[in-house]
Amino acid sequence: MKVERIKAIALDKKNAQQYAKTIACQQIGQPVKKVKYLGGGSFGRAYKIVFQNDEKIVVKFLRANDMLEKETHDLDLLAANCPVKIPKVLFSRKADNEVSVDCYGMELIEGSNAIFSLGLLLSSKRKRKQFADEVTTALQSIHSCKNDKFGDTLCSTYNRWLDFYKPYAEQILVKAEERFSKGELPKKVIEIMRAAWEKFDIIFSEEVTEACLIHGDFNIANMMIDKKHKLSGFIDPLNSMYADREYDLFQFDNLTGKRFFLRQTYVEKYGASKLCDIKCAFYGLYHEVYSYIKSGMLVGFIMNPLVKNMKKRLAEL
């Protein structure tokens, strides 16, 4: 995976809404009754489409090049290996003279994002643990899809996990040093990255023997729930790979994830390596810096706990 700043392609929200309506009508062959903006990150923008017959889909625009094949491939692959709903890709469309960005249509998962549900957040410990049980059972199903090589789902060629991951992590550190030298990255972040890198061979001393399919961005914000606070689906994979399955676990501690005992539940049910805690600390820190390098956005309420956790885990070595 390339570690570099990506400039988002301009896409006016008003124009995008009209594009979504036109494309949905063309691709599905039904008149559109309503279009609603659902949200988006640095490089995506999603719209809910309601047709006259009340069927609903989502059209997602990709504001960076070379994302379309990867995203649609990974959604289909994950959906085929997960008992919980992951949106089925309905169509894809490359950028052209009419629409300046790539896009695709997919199924709508009804419900709401788990991170915004106060009802779920404040529910009893029993219900939160039940939610964790449902999530981790589904994740283990994804992880049960294995490959004979490690690496990107589109091209996995590595015999060992670290043959893929160590050069990738080193790229992140090199780019982070460049950003720090320009005064763009806080000193506390680069210092803890350096300290963690010095201990890399210890942190990753346990051999990863299985190349497991991972979601890549498995945090509470990418879990959907229904009106009864039951798990209804997963969305937005990022850089899905055949990888160390524990790479999917660091996101469980981000945002409000700890409230649901997600990582604890997974480890209790399926086990983990002896160094899982410090590996997840490393994965989490370097992933967040990677996201910053790509987008230029440093999210303090995510980054600061990752820095603190990495310091704690290094002190425990």
Locate predicted features.
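An acidic site on a long C-lobe helix of protein kinase domains
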Residues: 131-134, 189, 217, 245, ...
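Short, surface-exposed acidic
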Residues: 30-35, 186-190, 272-280
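Short beta-strand segments
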Residues: 58-62, 90-91, 154, 213-216, ...
